[in-house]
C-alpha cells in the first residue's frame, strides 16, 4: 500500500518470487501486486475495518519470508472472518443475487464445442436436482485441506471445484504443491487444527523443543521467518528426532497486553485448552493449509473450458509458484475477483442457450434409483486422510506415492459410486478421491524437490523450472501412467 512508507511494489514482487521457489509467473506477480491498492479501497468501502493505530494509520504486521511489515489485519487476528462478514452482508443486501444454501454443484454442463453452459446442482435438504443455465460459471470453492489427516481448513475444503472442472475437461496445474502450515495448534484428538498465525512469529515468538531450546537457527538464516515449507520441514524433523507429536511456540517474550490486543482469537482458543500464551508454550505441529495448484487460469479467471472461470485457491494463476508467500492468498482472491468481474462486463454476455436435450433428460441419470441407501463415508474419509498424510504429505517418495495411489484405487472400489450420490457427504468424498489422484499423479511425475513438494528420493531441485499440467479422461489413463506406459496425463509448461 502507498500508505506503507517502508514498503514498495518491487519489494513485494521480490519476496513473492523468492518464496515461490522458481515457479511464480512474474507477469502475474507484478499485476497482482500493482493492483492491490484499488481492491483494498473496495474492501474498505464494503465495510471492512482494518486495524489502525492511535493516529488512525493502518498497522502492518510482519510474516514469514516478507522483508518488511506489510500485511494488513482486522480484528487483531480475525482478518479473514472480518472480510467474509463484510462481503456476506454486501451480497445479502443485493436483491439481484440469489443465494442457494445447502446446495452442491455436482456437474458442469459442457456442450460439444467445449463451452460451459451451466451447472447441475444437488439440494442436500430435499435430495432434488436442478439445472441452472448460465453464460458464465465462476468456481470459487476453496482448497483441499480435508484430504489430509491434519488440516487448518474447514470441513467443506474437499476440492469440489477442482474435481468439477477436471471432470469437465479443464487443465489443472501444479497439483503436487500442497502447503503445510508449520504452526497449527496440536491438541490430542483434534485433527481439524486451529491455525496459530504466522504473525505471532512475526511479532517475536520463537519455536522451541520440549526443553525450551530454540532450533530454527539450524535450518535457515531467517529462522522462524523462513519460507513456510522450510519451517514446516524443520518442525517435522524436530518432531521425528524427539519422537514427539509437536514442537512449541514460545510467545512469552511478547508483551501481555500486546498479545491480548493483537491476537484475541488465538488467546481465547488456547485458553479453552488451559494454555495462557503469555505464560505457557503453545504446542504446535504442521497441518495441510493451502493448495498452490488448481485449475489453470489467467488473471481474468479464464480456464481451458470456454465460459468457465475460477478464482482463489481453487484456481492456479501462477502467483504462488511452489510455495505461497504468507497472506498473498487473500490478495489474489480480491484482485482476481475484481478482474473477472470487469472482464465479464466487456463480453456483453447474452442469456444462456440450453444445450441439446431437455432438463429432464440432462438430470435423468441422477434420478434413477440405483442405490438403495446412503453410505456412511466417515470411516472411508478418515482412511483417505491417513493415506494422503502418510503417502503424499510433507515428505513423499515414489514408493509412498504409488502405495497411496493403490490404496485409493481400492477405496474407489469400496465406495462404488459413479455419477449419482445420495448425499452431500457422498459427493464430497467422490470429489476428494478425484483430487487425491491428481495430487499423487502430479507428485510422482515431478522427480525433484521444490518448494512445498519434497521428495526423499529426489532431494535436489532441477535447474529447469516448469509447471506441471494435468489432464485426464479416464481412470485407465492414470493406471497406465503409474505403470510407466505411454500416457499424456501430465505435461509440462515453461515458466514465463
Place the predicted regions along the sequence by residue:
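Conserved redox-cofactor binding core of oxidoreductases
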Residues: 44-128, 133, 140, 184-188
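Glycine- and aromatic-enriched mobile tails/lids
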Residues: 42, 51-68, 111, 201, ...
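N-terminal FAD cofactor-binding segment of flavoenzymes
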Residues: 1-50, 182-209, 213
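Short beta-strand to alpha-helix junction loop
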Residues: 24-34, 71-89, 100, 151-159, ...
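FAD-site-proximal beta/loop scaffold in flavoenzymes
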Residues: 107-131, 275-317
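Flavin (primarily FAD) binding-site architecture
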Residues: 139-151
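A short alpha-helix-loop-beta-strand transition element characteristic
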Residues: 23-26, 40-57, 98, 171-174, ...
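An anion/pyrophosphate-binding glycine-rich loop and adjacent beta-alpha core
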Residues: 164, 170-282, 343-349
Amino acid at each position: 500500500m502507498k500508505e506503507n512508507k517502508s514498503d514498495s511494489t518491487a519489494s513485494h514482487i521480490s519476496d513473492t518470487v523468492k518464496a515461490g521457489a522458481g515457479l511464480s509467473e512474474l507477469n502475474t506477480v507484478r499485476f497482482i501486486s500493482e493492483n492491490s491498492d484499488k481492491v483494498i479501497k473496495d474492501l474498505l468501502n464494503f465495510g471492512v475495518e482494518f486495524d489502525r493505530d492511535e493516529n488512525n494509520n493502518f498497522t502492518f504486521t510482519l510474516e514469514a519470508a516478507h522483508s518488511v511489515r506489510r500485511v494488513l489485519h482486522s480484528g487483531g487476528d480475525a482478518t479473514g472472518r472480518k472480510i467474509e462478514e463484510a462481503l456476506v452482508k454486501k451480497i445479502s443486501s443485493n436483491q439481484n443475487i440469489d443465494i442457494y444454501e445447502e446446495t452442491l454443484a455436482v456437474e458442469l454442463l459442457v456442450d460439444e464445442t467445449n463451452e460451459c453452459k451451466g451447472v447441475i446442482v444437488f439440494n442436500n435438504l430435499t435430495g432434488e436436482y436442478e439445472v441452472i443455465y448460465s453464460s458464465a460459471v465462476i468456481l470459487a470453492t476453496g482448497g483441499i485441506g480435508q484430504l489430509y489427516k491434519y488440516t487448518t481448513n474447514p470441513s467443506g475444503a474437499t476440492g469440489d471445484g477442482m474435481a468439477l472442472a477436471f471432470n469437465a475437461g479443464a487443465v489443472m496445474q501444479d497439483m503436487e504443491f500442497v502447503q503445510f502450515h508449520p504452526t497449527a495448534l496440536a491438541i490430542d484428538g483434534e485433527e481439524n487444527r486451529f491455525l496459530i498465525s504466522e504473525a505471532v512469529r512475526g511479532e517475536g515468538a520463537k519455536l522451541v523443543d520440549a526443553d525450551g531450546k530454540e532450533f530454527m537457527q539450524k535450518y535457515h538464516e531467517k529462522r522462524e521467518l523462513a519460507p513456510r515449507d522450510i519451517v514446516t520441514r524443520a518442525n517435522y524433523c524436530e518432531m521425528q528426532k524427539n519422537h514427539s507429536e509437536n514442537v512449541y511456540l514460545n510467545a512469552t517474550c511478547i508483551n501481555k497486553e500486546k498479545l491480548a490486543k493483537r491476537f484475541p482469537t488465538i488467546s481465547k482458543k488456547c485458553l479453552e485448552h488451559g494454555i495462557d500464551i503469555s505464560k505457557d508454550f503453545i504446542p504446535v505441529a504442521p497441518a495441510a493449509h493451502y493448495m498452490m495448484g488448481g485449475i489453470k487460469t489467467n488473471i481474468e479467471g479464464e480456464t481451458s473450458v470456454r465460459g468457465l472461470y475460477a478464482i482463489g485457491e481453487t484456481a492456479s494463476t501462477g502467483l504462488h509458484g511452489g510455495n505461497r508467500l504468507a497472506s498473498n492468498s487473500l490478495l489474489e482472491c480480491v484482485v482476481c475477483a475484481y478482474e473477472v468481474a470487469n472482464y465479464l462486463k466487456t463480453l456483453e454476455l447474452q442469456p444462456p442457450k440450453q444445450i441439446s436435450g431437455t432438463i429432464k433428460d440432462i438430470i435423468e441419470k441422477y434420478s434413477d434409483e440405483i442405490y438403495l441407501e446412503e453410505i456412511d463415508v466417515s470411516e472411508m474419509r478418515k482412511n483417505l486422510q491417513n493415506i494422503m498424510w502418510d503417502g503424499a504429505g510433507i515428505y513423499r517418495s515414489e514408493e509412498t506415492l504409488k502405495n497411496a495411489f493403490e490404496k485409493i484405487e481400492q477405496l474407489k472400489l469400496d465406495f462404488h459410486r459413479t455419477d449419482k450420490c445420495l448425499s452431500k457427504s457422498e459427493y464430497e468424498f467422490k470429489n476428494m478421491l478425484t483430487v487425491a489422484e491428481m495430487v499423487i499423479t502430479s507428485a510422482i511425475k515431478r522427480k525433484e524437490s521444490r518448494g512445498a513438494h519434497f521428495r526423499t528420493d529426489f532431494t535436489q531441485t532441477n535447474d529447469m523450472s516448469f509447471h506441471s499440467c494435468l489432464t485426464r479422461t479416464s481412470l485407465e489413463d492414470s493406471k497406465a501412467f503409474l505403470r510407466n506406459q505411454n500416457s499424456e496425463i501430465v505435461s509440462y509448461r515453461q515458466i514465463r
